[in-house]
Every structure is written in C-alpha cells, then in structure tokens.
Amino acid sequence: MASSLAAQLSQIAANSTNQLNLKAQRISHSQSLIFDRKVAGSQDFDTIYDICNEGFQELCELDPRFAQFERTIFSEQSKVQERTEMNAAQNKELDAVLETFLALVGGKLLLSPAVKAVEWLVRRFRIHEYNTEFTILTFLPYHTTPLFLNLLSILPEDLTPTFKILNPYKKSSVNPPRHPLVHSATTNKPFFAALNRYTIQVSKEQAGHHALLTFWAGIVTESVAGMLDSARSGRRNIEKENHDDIIMRVLPVLNDGLAMKDVAELVIGCYMVCVAIAQKASLHDKVLDSLMEAVAESWTEETVNSGLVCLAVLAQKKPDTTLPKRVFKAILRLENPLQQLSETSKQHRASQLLLGLVAGCVQDLSKQKDTARLDFLSLMFESELLGEAELGSGMAIVLRASSNSHKDGAMSLDAQTHLADLVQHFSRSESLRPIFQKTVAESSFDIVAIEQNLQTVIESAPAPKALEDIEMEDAEKEEEQDNFAPALKSLTGSSFKGSYLSTQSIPVYDNLVRAFALGIGAQEKLDAFANLPALDKGNAAKSPQYLSFFVRVFSGSYPIGTRVAALNMVSSFLTTASIDMDLQALLPFVLVTLADPSERVRREAAGILTIIGSLHKNKKGDAPGGVWARDTIYGQDKQPKNIQWTPGRDLQKVFERALLPGLEEYVIDPDHIGRVLEATLRGSSVSDSESSELKKAVRLSFFTCLCSHAVHVPLYAPKLGLLKLLNRVEKAGGTTRTKELGSLLKSWREMDGQQAKDVCEKERVPVSEMESQIVLTVTPKERDAITVLLSNVSPYSGSLSPSFVGAIFGRMKDVWAKVPEDRQALAAENLFEISLEQSDSPLVDGCKDVLRSVELPGAVLSQFLQKIPSTVTDMEGLGPAPKRRRTSQSNMVAMTVKDEAALSELMEKMTFILELVDSSSPETHPELADGLFQTLAALHHFKSQVQSGMSYLLSLALGSLLAIVNRSKTIGKPQFDTSVIRADLVVDCVRTTDSPQVQNAALLLVAGLSVIAPELVLHSVMPIFTFMGSSVLKKDDDYSVSVIDQTIDQVVPALIQSLRNQKRDVVSGTSELLLSFTAAFEHIPSHRRLRLFHALITKLGTQDFLFAVLSMLANRYSMDKDVLILMTGLVSDANAPVELATYSKYLGLVSDSLKAKPGISQVLLGIGSDDGREPQKVAVDLLRALAYLFRHSSLKSKMAKAFAIVEGDEPQQIRALFSQILEQTLAIGDNMQDMKSVGQASGEVLSALFGTLSLVDFLDTIEVLLQRPNDELRRKVLRLLEGRLRQNPERDSPSQTRMLDFLSVLVKIVESSPDILLKHAAVACIDRIADKYGKKDPSKVIPAARVVASEVCIGQEDDRIRIMGVLCLASMAEVLGQAMIPALPDTLSRSLALLGLSLEDGKENTRLHDAVYSLFSALFVHLPYMISASHLDKVLVLSYKSAMNDEFEEESRQEALRLMAKKVDASATFGAVDRNWQHAVQAGPEATKETLEVVSMAIEKHPKSSTAKNLPVITNILFKAFDLRREQLALGSDATFDLSDVDEIEETINEVTIKMIYKLNDSTFRPIFTKLLEWATTGVSKKDTQGSLARHTTFYKFLQVFFGTLQSIVTGYASYIIENVVSVLSKASPSNPNTKSLWLATMRLLKNAFEHDQDEFWQSPSHLTKIATPLISQLAHATHPTTATLVINEAIPAITELAVAADSTDNHKELNTVLMRYLRPSAGPTGKAAGGENPHTRLAALKTEQSLTEQLGEEWLALLPEMLPYISELMEDEDENVEKEVRKWVKQIEDVLGEKLDDMLT
C-alpha cells in the first residue's frame, strides 16, 4: 500500500507543472530552437516576442494566409498566455490553431522567418511538449538538417512509442538517416498511421508542400513494399490474409489522397503506393478495377502522365484485357490520348492497358452511337503504339468482335465501314500484313462471317478450311436474326423522283443503303430490293433513280462488299436491259472507282467500263436517245450548259484509243487509270501499244467534261476521286486545270470551316485531303499562280477555315520555285506588305511563313534591305528636336514618341527584313554587303535616338555580314566591293552593346575583315581589345570561346605586322592590348585562362612578349595563387634559353621600374603615371612572383636536359643567361639595401634561382659567392644551402662527394669568422651535411665535429651558437657512432657544463637544456659504453635539478633518462641510481618518480640474468624506496612529500618490484620476501610505533599488489604473514586516521589472497581458524554510518572470499557461528553482550549474510536452521534499516530455495 502510494505520488511529481518549482521552470524556459540554453534562459517574453514577431511579419509578406494568426497566437495578448492556467477546452482550441499554423509553416521551415515564428510556439506555447506528434511530423521532412537536430534536443525524454525510433538519435545528438524512418514506418503501425494522418490533414488544409509530400510518398511507398515483403509466407492463405490486412490499412489513405485532385504531389504519391501494392501483392480483379477507377477519376492535367503509368502497372496485373468503363472513358476524354499513351509506354510496359483500350473500342458495336471509338481504334493501329505481340492480340480482339457482331443486332453502316476499312488496313499494310496473316492462321475465326458482317473481303486471309470443318461450324451456328425483311417492308411505300447524286442529304437514300447492305449475299433479297418503288427500275433507262443510287453506293465510302454488290447491280442491269442512250454520265464515277485500292472493286468497275465502251462502239456516233440523265444527273436545278458533254464520236475514240486498251492493268494496278488519263489528256500514249494519240479537240472536250463533273458533282467522295485524277494534268487541249477548276476553289473558299467539315464527314472524306486537292488545281504554269492563290485568302475573312488557309500557303511554297523571277519579286512585295499588317490573322502569319520558307532572289532581298534606312529616316520626326539632342549631356535623349504604334511597326518591319536576309543564306548573295552596312549604320543611328540596344537586330545584320565575309575568306578574295566596309560601325557594336551575341558576331566580323581587308580595319581594332578585356573574355560558353580564339588568331598577327611595318616598338605598341587581357584575368573562367593567354602570347611572339605578360600579371595581381599557376603554365611551354631570356628581360623591367626616370616600365607597369603604384611595391611583387616561377616551373629539368646534350650551343646560352640573371638579382639586392622589402624579395629570387641548379653547380656558385666580403650575402647564401639540404637533396655520388668536401669551407668559417650569425649558419649547414651525407665518409666529418665541440663553437658565450652546436653534435653522434670518440671528451665536458648553466637560477635556458638532452639521447643510443659513472652521476643530479624546475619541458629529459635505462649497462645505471637516491628524494616527488622509472625501464629492457646479477643493488634501491613513507613521516613538518605523493610513489615501487619478481625464481625471491617481512615487522625499535606503522602500511600495500597480481602462484606466501595480520587486525581500525590506511590495505590484501586460492590453503583449519574470528570481528567497527560504509565495502568482500575459499560445510558453520554473534544485541537470557549491540553492526552482519547467500547460494543456506531464530528476531528489530535489510535477505533466501519462509519463521 505504502509503496503503491509512493509510486503514484512520484508520478504526479514528475508530471507536475508546479509554478513554485523555479528550477524546472528555468529549464523549460531555456529550451529553444535557435538560441543557446544560456542565452535562452536569460530572455524574457517581451524580448522573445519582438524577435519572433519580426519573423512572423516577414512570413505574412510571403504568404497572406499567415495574417489570420496575428489576432491569436501572435497577438500582444499571447505574451501573457500560460497553458498551465488554461482549461481543457481552451487548450484544445489553442491546439487547433497551433496545428493549423504548423501545417502552413511546414513548407517554409528552411527560411529564417519561419524558424523565428516557430520559436515563439516553442517558447510560449511549448508545442514540443503539448503538441509533440504534430511538431515532430512538421519537422520530419527536414530530418537531415541541423534544424531537426535542434528540435530533437528539446523534445521530452519520454517520447511515445510512435516515435521511439528517434530516441537513440536524440541521445547521441545526430540526425536520423532515412533508412531507420522507413524501417519504423514498416514495422511501427502507430508511426505509419500518424504520418499518413498528418499528411492527409495538412493537404486538406491546402498546406501541403513539396518537402512533405515527396518525403511522405517516398517513405510510405517503401514501407508498404517492405510490409508486403515481410508478410510473405510459404502458405498462400496466410500470405493472402497478411496482404489483405496491409491493404485494408492503406486503402483509406489512398481514397483520401486520390480525392484531393488539386494536390498534385499527394496524388502522384498515391499512384506510387498503388504501384507498390500492385507489384508486391496478388490483388483481386475487383480491387484492381477499383484502384484503376480511383486513379482515372483523380488525375488532372498535371498528374495525368503519372496516372497513366500507374494504370499501366495495374493493368499488367489483370488476368484479362478488359478495362472498367470509367477508366476507358477517362482515357478517351484526354486531350491527346495517343501521345500520352506513347509517353507512358516508354516509361513502363503498357501492353495490357493498350489491349484493354482496343477491347473497349469494339465492345457493344451495335450500341455505339457514333464512330469516335472506332476512329480512336484506327489511330491506335496507325500510330505504332502497339508492339508486334500486342498488334497480333489487338487484331484478334477486333476480328473476334467483328465475327460476333451479328449476334448482338446489326451495327450501323458507319461502324461497319470503319471496321471494314481497319481490317483492310491490316491486310494491305506492308508492316501489318505478316502479323495479320499469322493471327488469322493461328486463330479459329469464322472468316466468312467476318466478311459477311463487314461487307468486305479479307484479301490476305489463308485458304478456307476443309469442307467438313465448315459444315461442322455451320451446324453449330446459332440461328441469326433476319433484319432484311422488316427493312424492305418499311421502304415499300417510299418513293423518290430524281437523281440520288443530286444532293448529299436524301433521307430515303440512307434507308435504302441499309436495306441494300442487309440483302447482300442473297440474290432473291437483292431482286426484291431492286424492285422497290424508290428505285423505279422499270424506267431506269429514262429516269436516273435506279442507276444513280448504285453509282452513289459504289463511288462512296462503304464496305468493299457493299460497293462490289452495287457495281454488280449496275453491270447486271447494263447487260440485260436494252439501252439506246449515251451512258457517259456514268464514266467519271467508273473512272474514279478504277483507282480504288480494292482489286475486287476495280475488277467490277473494269467490267462496267467494258460494257459502256461496247455500247458506244455499237452506236457509231451519238446515241439516238441522247445522253442518259443529261438534265437530271445532279438535280433539276443544274442547267445542262453547266455540264460539258463529250460528243459520242469523240467519246468512242477515247474509249478505243485510251480507256479500253488498259483494262487488265486497271485491275492489277490502282494507279494505272491515273497514268492513262494523264497521258491521254497531254496528248501522249501510255505505252508503245497500238493506241494512238487523240486530237487536241477531243482531248479538250474530254478534259472539260471531266472537269465540269468534278466542279458540279454535289458529292465529295467522287469529287475527291476525280480531283486526284485531274490534278495529274496541268494542261490539256489548250486549257489549264486552273482555268477549268477555278470555280471549285472559289466555291470552297466561300464555304466556312464548319460547313466544310460537316460535308466531308458525311461522306467520310478527310477535310485536309479535300483541301489539298482543291488547292492543287492551281498550277505553276499559271503565270500569276501566287497571285491567284493569294486572292483566295486576301482580303482575309473570319469564315475561312484555318486548314484551307494553310493549304493555300502550302501550295504557294510548292509552286514558288517554278514561278518566273519577275513574278516572284512582285509576289514577294505583295506578301511583304501583308506581312507587316498589324494583325494576328492566319493571313499575316501565312505570308510571313511563305517569305521565310521560300528562296528569295538577291534582288528582292536587296530591295527589302533598302527599306530600312529610308524607314529610319522617315522616323526622324518621332525623335526629339535636333537642338535638344545636341545640347543633351549624353547626346542620347530618349525619343519623345508621338506614335508608339509606328515605332513598334518599324521595329517589327526591320526585324522581319533582317530575319529574311539571315535565313536566305546571305553568303550566296554578296551583293547584300552594301545594304547590310547601310542597315548597320541606320540601326546605330536609330539606337541613339531611342536609347535601345536593339541587340537582336544588330546580331542579325552582323550575322549576315559575317556569312558573306566568311565565304570571301574561303574563296581567298572579297566577293563584294570592299569600299562599303564600315569597320567603325562594327567596333561600335562591340563597344556599346551588352549583348553577348552581338559582341561575338562583331568580333568574328572584325576578325574576318582583318583577313580580307586589313588596311580598312586595323586602325579601329584597339578599342575592341579594351572592350574584350572588360566583357567578352569572362564568357564561358563554347561559342564565345571560339569567337575569342578566332579574334586572336586573325587580328593579332595582322596588328603586329602593321606595327612592324610602321617601325614602332611592338611591345609598347600593344601594351593596351596586353593590359586588356591582364585586367580581364579575374573574369576569365579558370579552366580557360591558360589556353587563352598561351594563344595570345603565341600569336604575339613568345620571345618578345612573354616577359611583358608575366610582369603585367604580377604587377596587377601580386601573389594571387591562380595568377601564379597561370604564369607557371605559360613559361613551362618555352624552352630553357627562351625562359631564361624572358626572366632576364623581366628583371631588366624590375630594375627599370626602380630608376628615377623609368622607361618601358612606365608603359607596361604604369610606373610614374598618376594612377600608378609605388615603384618599390611593384618591384617587390614582381620579384616575389619571379621567385615563385623559379621554384615551381620546369626550368631545372629543362636545364638538366640541355646540359646532358653535349652538342650545340644551347648549354653555353643557358650558362650565359643564368649568370646574367644572377648578376641582375645581386645588383638589385646591392642597390636596394636601403629598401628592406626589395632586398628581401631579391633574396627570395636568389634562393629560388639557386634551386634551379644541381647540387654540384649550386655549391660551385656558393663557394664563389662566399668569397665576397658582404657578410649579409654570405649568411643569405648559407641559409639557402641549409634550406636546400632540409629538403630532399641529390644523393648521387658526385653530389655527396662534393658536399663532404665543402665541409672544409664551412669549418674554416666557424674557426675564423667573428660574425656569430655567419658561424651559426655555417654550423647549421654542417649539421645538415653530416646528417644527410656523413655516413658516406665519416672521416671527413670528424674535423668538423672537433671544431664544433671546441671553444670556437659551443664554447662561445652566445647561446645561439651553443644551441646550434650541441644539436649539430647530436646529429653527428647519430651519424658517426664510434667515429665520434675523438671529439667525445670535449663534447661531454662542455655539454654537461652547458646543461648546468641552463639550469642556473634566474638564467634558465630551455632551448639549451633541451639541446643538451638531445645530445645525451644520441650518445646513450650510439655510444653508451663511453659514458662513465661520473658522467652518469652528473646527468642524474642535473636531471633532478631540472625536474624541480617547472619552466623546463620534461619530455626531452625523460626521453634521455629512458634511453639511459635502456642502452647503458644495467649495473652502471643501477649503481648511479643507488648512489644518487638521496639526491632524488631531496629533489622532490617528480625526481623520485623519474628515478624509479629509470629502475623500472632498466629491469624491463635488460635480460633476467642482468636482474639476477644486480639483485643486491636493486634490492637496496627498493628497500630505500619502501622506507620513504617512514622517512617522510619522521620529518614531520619538514617533509617534502605529501601523503598523496607517497601513495603515488609507492604504487610505482610496487610495479617495479613486481617487474623484478617476474625476472626471478622462487628460490631467489623468497629470501628477499622474508627479509622484507622482517624489515617491516622488526626493522625498527618497538618504541618507534609511528615508524613501525608506516613500514607495515607500505608492506601491506605491496602485499595487496603482490597477491592481486601474482594470484595463486604466491598463495603459500600467506603463511608468512598470518600471525602478523592477526596482530594488525587487533590493532588497526578504520575509524583511526593513523591506522585507516593500514586497515584498508589489510582488508584488500586478504581479499586478494582468499580470492586466488587454488591450493586449498584456506580450507586448512589451522589457517582458517587463525584468521576467521579476527576478520569477522572487523564487523564490530561498524558503529556509525561512515565506518559502516567502509566495513561493508571492504570487510564484507574479504569475508565473502574467505567463505568461498573455505569451501566446506564445517568451515562455513564455523564462520557462521562467529558471524551470527553480530546479528544479536545480547547472547540470550543471560543478557550477555554478543557483539551486535549497535544497529550499524547488525546491518553490516546482515549485509555479510546477504553477500554470502548471493555468492554461495544453497551451500550457505544449508545453515538456515540455525539462522532462522536470528531472522525472526531481526524481523522485529527496533531499527528500521535492519528490518528492511532482513526482509531483503528473506526474499533473497526464498528466491534461492524457491519456497516461502513464512512457515519456518512462525
């Protein structure tokens, strides 16, 4: 009860927001997104509000939707709102506002204002605590940013399981990567649901943003895929259940997401999830259909492409090809479904989707009200959308639907015709025919039924099946519905008077055609049909009804079977009837039918042609009955004069000579009739057959007859067929088709677009094809063909069809080239005038398009160009008054435009003209150059008037000129009059425009002109380079690069040649050019700089110009790294003599710049000019850049290669130039000694210059320079040598020999020079030489060593030379080894003296101190045997002194002492330590520790034999060290060691002793141990209790380590100490400060001794009995909390280990008996004290029992019976802590035994 209440109270406290808990409030207030905790904690809400409100106001400017929060969470009132004071309803209302704000601000969290605004929500409303889920999800899309890390740091520690994934990242303060989030969404249902819930909510609020929606889509898609993968099972039913569960969780999210069409990214994300589900799970067909419908209904223009891909994936998973109707209709409603499906199929396999569309198109054929679906179906097959396999499947679907169409009722004639055409397309197409044949062959389609249903013939179908198969099929056929009889009956009462060709819309005709189509295939039905009153067959010879009906059918767009049947009906009638009339009215329709694609149709038409021909042959002239239907063929309203009829005799000639000879070819080839008519009407024969040409009159009569029919026939299907035939003939019998068919063009023009579309659609004639044939009636033979065509669209009428206008202009383009040039000029002028009309009509656009598309003559282009200057002149009146322009400050006053429309018109006119010129291959019209330059001048003039750049116009004019100039360059001479060239205008284009295109074109033009007419260009060229430097060179596109290259290649050589011709200095003459390029350096893209400058220098001449470019770059950019790299690249391409000559000129320029009256440097570097820099600074920059070039160029390798070549004078040139450069450098240094910066820079050059020499050459040069009297130069030279040696100098044999020989020069300097700095430099060089080359010949180094060790070097008073000398000796010791011995005496004596000097009080010298120790380190390593005992003593004593001084670094000293311990003979080391131990102790703890480390290292690094040999001295040292505690305590207040120092040193001593023990055997060590025991126990007088206590403490601390380290090996040694330990236990106490350390050491040594007993030592009663009672009695020391803690921590582990070691029930009983005494305050009824009087003692005893129970378990609990009474008593103990602990013990016992103690305790 009590504990439960306590838990509840603690939970309430944890969740409490007590306002009096100020610390908690401060912590909460300091949690911030943007401020450090300390800063945040110091801010008040006014300050925070001001900062955050500023961000909020900026947000409002970005998005006005934030303004609503200004009245709520960002109001002034919000500063005093405290959530803890608000009730639940208010908090809920606040949460809603906060979540709305967070949703809106989520997309802007990477912006600073948004973070500031959210900071207010954190600080004031603590959203991270109260709205944790919404806050985390708002920030989660940015989980990789520092902002999210800031949020993690302030989130509560107890995150809900939803976000448990964030806990490890919160603790380690790192951003969570994406993978764990995906894993969490996959495995953590609450997280998955929360993410979806948040995304849908935010999207509904129209606050969805890219970061969230892409994050959500990616995470959810991957997690759903992961869920489905992990749900897989070997048992299908279980896997299905698992998948269904997942899908049921996801589908509501998809429904909500797909419903929000306007949130495009959310919808696309839902598509991704749908795809994942489809690919990972096996879905029911209904589920797939539902998903597909949801997708199709959700897409918008923005998401449709993704939606189609999703549909394609879903469709692939369907078992069949059917699509839901909604999906099918949605796809058909798309703006351009075929293109979109094509894009979809590129992204994903879409075969099932496409076949589903095919199936949808042919579904319910009888119910389709229009042909939209079938039109779409045809387009699908024509668009190559389907692959080969899908094509076969699609064809099979179409054929199956066609085969079964009769079962669902008759389909419409249009549908029948559509399908028939499609099937014919399958059989006729080259690409589709093989697939179609294969499909038909592999399937069991009823071909006969298909042909019957479609009224067509499948020409490429395989042979019919065997007779018996057909019979079987027939037997199985269902009884079909007979639709013919009702249709016939409905027509019985109908009648029609007139021709069925008279008009398009005849109601009875449509009914007749349907009935006729139903009757095909049964002769009796056709006979019945033919006798209908509406056909009036009885009067067929006189009235037109009968024949005109069938003519209209066979010449219309009907199925092949229907048309063939109609032809048969006509043929049958003509064969059986007695006709005495001229049937030429049928001829145009028969001729059209002979061009039909179907062979069956052509065959029947050929038959009719034969019949008509034979009738005419029999007549031998005009028919007695006249021409059949002469007045009624096209209706009563058509006057006979409108139709031109051919006389019978002439027609007979046409039949005999032209038409009938080719009957067989007509059937075979549908194009043959066209060729026959073309040849006949032109007056030539088709072949060399017997047919002869017709006379002109006959041809004219026949041609006009056909043309009149084409014009007047009201039906457009035959009209189109006739036009296709007639448009092959341009001219016949003296007339043209333009003349004969012109009225057709006019009548079509008068028809508006919709009307034209309607009339064509009625007969299924393509409008575009009809318009194309109509405009083809205008031939180029017509002189004014362009004018005729233009007259049909100009003036423009809004009723004109855009496609007709397009066809007219298309025809213009086709005939243009065949029109005479004078007519082209006239037409071009007309078209141009119309093009400039201010209208957006198709007429204007068409005229422009024609002019742009056709090839305009040069004269026309010139005429156009002349319009520009004249028009600009006319515009002068629009500008400001001339006086205003003259007095204007800039001379460019903006125009005061009176008529802006006129200005716009002018600009458009100029643009159009220049575009025409540009697109007309101006290079082929060089005569345009004059006009173009005039245009350029006009444009410049006009540009200054209107203050407009007119970049596009300029680029057009320049581009055309450039094309002309480039052609002239190719040919080699100008193709135009060069006097018209205006170079100033071209240069002006470069200078005054900001357009890169204009600049590039102008530069290329200048380059081209400089080749063909240099004398006219070069005087204007320099401003170009000035401008290039500031503008053009910075461009980085490939074209601009090419322009710059060409300009340099072509202009620069011409410029240089011009300067030379004028005998001017080329360098100074081109300084402006060079300055332009150097000034442009920083603007030039980095990767192009080197190539550009290299090209420039190459064209200018490397020998003459490289130094100038280098100096100008160095002057302008100083030590800019990029510039230096460029300069290095430029010199690397030159050979060694050129490079050196360049440097010599460069140094000459430096010298010139420092003169009182500079020369060329004034021109190149601006020295002495008003805006020039100080000469001194210029010189420094140039010299430092030169030093860089020497160091980083390839000059050294070039010189080496040159010297390797013996022949030629190049080596001599190099030596001469090098000497010259050296002299120039030294001269600058000598002359400028008063200018320190110049002197230093010249020194750098000298150093770098020497770096280019080989080592041998370098030394030769140095040796000469060292003979000069200038000490500064000599020091500089030696420093250069040292620097060279510090790098990686040459190691070849000549170099080594020369370097060692050079030592004598250096030794001489050390011996003789009074200049300490020079000596220092010489010793530094000796040091380097000895280090690098000394081992090759040590004998040459010995003299140097002696000199360095002598008085003249380290014996000097100057510390610099001393330090350098000592370091040099250290290097020599390493290199020379024993060869160093001759110099050793001086070295040792002087170095020890120097070490002593460095340690003198007040004169400490750390550098000298470290140098000496470096020397001794080297000596200890290489010459340890030469260090005497006295030297070792001095080293140790001085080291102790060094250790006492904190100013010295200990590293060098300790390293030397370690090396002494390792390398010097062990006996010498131990002896020195023994002799100087007292000095070490006097020096203090640091020295003592270092001394012990020397002993430790010596023992460790030397062999066992050495330790055994030196055992007496080692033991002596250790005994001295062990006695340190006693000695220091004896000194009292004079002690130099703190107790902590003593403890630390004793730890070291113990480690050293253990190391020593490892190197000894038992027989060797045991005497030492007994001696140590005696030393500790009896070594001091009994009166000296303090001394005895100190030695015991030290000894016992050693024993603690001894038993703990050596463990079971030394357990037996405990027998030596038992008695003494018992004695100590009786005296020592943890409560006594003097004995506490001893007591602790005793407890710990006993624990270690017990713990590692493996020899049953402590099981022995003799050992156990002695120690048990004294040890357990230590529990009695637990009398108050402090001692109780010590006893529990130290004594109990020892007692426990003893019990473990005792390992027997008897021993345990003995221990427990003693132990239980301390569990009772008295021994029973006697009332005698038992030992447990103090509750702390009883508690300690209880803790012991607990420890023993835990360690020994049931072994110890075997003693439980005797413990039970004690337990019962203790459970009633008066001390609460005792009672608490005994209950713990009882619980522990019960856990071990597995049963309750309640019964035992009652």
UniProtKB/Swiss-Prot annotation:
<keyword id="KW-0698">rRNA processing</keyword>
<dbReference type="Pfam" id="PF08146">
    <property type="entry name" value="BP28CT"/>
</dbReference>
<feature type="repeat" description="HEAT 5">
    <location>
        <begin position="1758"/>
        <end position="1795"/>
    </location>
</feature>
<keyword id="KW-0472">Membrane</keyword>
<feature type="transmembrane region" description="Helical">
    <location>
        <begin position="946"/>
        <end position="966"/>
    </location>
</feature>
<keyword id="KW-0812">Transmembrane</keyword>
<feature type="transmembrane region" description="Helical">
    <location>
        <begin position="1002"/>
        <end position="1022"/>
    </location>
</feature>
<dbReference type="InterPro" id="IPR016024">
    <property type="entry name" value="ARM-type_fold"/>
</dbReference>
<dbReference type="GO" id="GO:0032040">
    <property type="term" value="C:small-subunit processome"/>
</dbReference>
<comment type="similarity">
    <text>Belongs to the HEATR1/UTP10 family.</text>
</comment>
<feature type="repeat" description="HEAT 3">
    <location>
        <begin position="1253"/>
        <end position="1290"/>
    </location>
</feature>
<keyword id="KW-0677">Repeat</keyword>
<dbReference type="GO" id="GO:0034455">
    <property type="term" value="C:t-UTP complex"/>
</dbReference>
<dbReference type="InterPro" id="IPR040191">
    <property type="entry name" value="UTP10"/>
</dbReference>
<feature type="repeat" description="HEAT 1">
    <location>
        <begin position="581"/>
        <end position="618"/>
    </location>
</feature>
<dbReference type="InterPro" id="IPR011989">
    <property type="entry name" value="ARM-like"/>
</dbReference>
<protein>
    <recommendedName>
        <fullName>U3 small nucleolar RNA-associated protein 10</fullName>
    </recommendedName>
</protein>
<dbReference type="Pfam" id="PF23243">
    <property type="entry name" value="HEAT_HEATR1"/>
</dbReference>
<keyword id="KW-1133">Transmembrane helix</keyword>
<dbReference type="InterPro" id="IPR056473">
    <property type="entry name" value="HEAT_Utp10/HEAT1"/>
</dbReference>
<dbReference type="InterPro" id="IPR021133">
    <property type="entry name" value="HEAT_type_2"/>
</dbReference>
<dbReference type="GO" id="GO:0030686">
    <property type="term" value="C:90S preribosome"/>
</dbReference>
<dbReference type="GO" id="GO:0000462">
    <property type="term" value="P:maturation of SSU-rRNA from tricistronic rRNA transcript (SSU-rRNA, 5.8S rRNA, LSU-rRNA)"/>
</dbReference>
<keyword id="KW-0687">Ribonucleoprotein</keyword>
<keyword id="KW-0539">Nucleus</keyword>
<dbReference type="InterPro" id="IPR012954">
    <property type="entry name" value="BP28_C_dom"/>
</dbReference>
<dbReference type="Pfam" id="PF12397">
    <property type="entry name" value="U3snoRNP10"/>
</dbReference>
<comment type="subunit">
    <text>Component of the ribosomal small subunit (SSU) processome.</text>
</comment>
<dbReference type="GO" id="GO:0045943">
    <property type="term" value="P:positive regulation of transcription by RNA polymerase I"/>
</dbReference>
<dbReference type="GO" id="GO:0030515">
    <property type="term" value="F:snoRNA binding"/>
</dbReference>
<keyword id="KW-0690">Ribosome biogenesis</keyword>
<comment type="function">
    <text>Involved in nucleolar processing of pre-18S ribosomal RNA. Involved in ribosome biosynthesis.</text>
</comment>
<feature type="repeat" description="HEAT 4">
    <location>
        <begin position="1297"/>
        <end position="1335"/>
    </location>
</feature>
<dbReference type="GO" id="GO:0016020">
    <property type="term" value="C:membrane"/>
</dbReference>
<dbReference type="InterPro" id="IPR022125">
    <property type="entry name" value="U3snoRNP10_N"/>
</dbReference>
<feature type="repeat" description="HEAT 2">
    <location>
        <begin position="1046"/>
        <end position="1083"/>
    </location>
</feature>
